[in-house]
């Protein structure tokens, strides 16, 4: 092959059985350093863990609000009952209207 093929980063040779050989270019060898690569991994891991902690915090806040909504709606009934009766206002009005209709029919 020619000199231009080896400077481009790959060279192929069909005669000796290899089709594609990769050679590092000058740009990739200057950028690829082990300490720089390791610091990039630390940055990505720290960003991931920060986002994970933030999402966990949002989930906890949402669950607390949901728990407060559920507990406030179940602990305070709209119409407190007298003498242990479990009738709602609608049921009481319905019963009283049926009684008045029955008394009008009977008289």
Curated annotation (Swiss-Prot):
Task: State the source organism's domain of life.
Answer: Eukaryota
Q: Which UniProt keywords apply?
A: Membrane, Transmembrane, Transmembrane helix
Gene Ontology CC annotations of this record: intracellular membrane-bounded organelle; membrane
- Where is the protein found, in the record's own terms? Membrane
Protein name according to UniProt: Serine-rich and transmembrane domain-containing protein 1
Mark the transmembrane ranges.
Answer: 43-63
Matches recorded under InterPro entries: SERTM
Its membrane topology is listed as: Single-pass membrane protein
| Coiled-coil stretches noted in the UniProt entry, renumbered to this chain | none
């Amino acid at each position: 092959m020619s000199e231009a093929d080896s400077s481009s980063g790959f060279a192929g040779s069909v005669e000796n059985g290899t089709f594609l050989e990769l050679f590092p270019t000058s740009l990739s060898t200057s950028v690829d350093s082990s300490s720089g690569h390791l610091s990039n991994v630390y940055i990505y891991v720290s960003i991931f863990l920060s986002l994970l902690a933030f999402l966990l915090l949002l989930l906890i806040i949402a669950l607390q609000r949901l728990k407060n909504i559920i507990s406030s709606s179940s602990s305070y009934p709209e119409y407190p009952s007298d003498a242990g009766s479990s009738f709602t206002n609608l049921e009481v009005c319905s019963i009283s209207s049926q009684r008045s209709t029955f008394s009008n029919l009977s008289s």
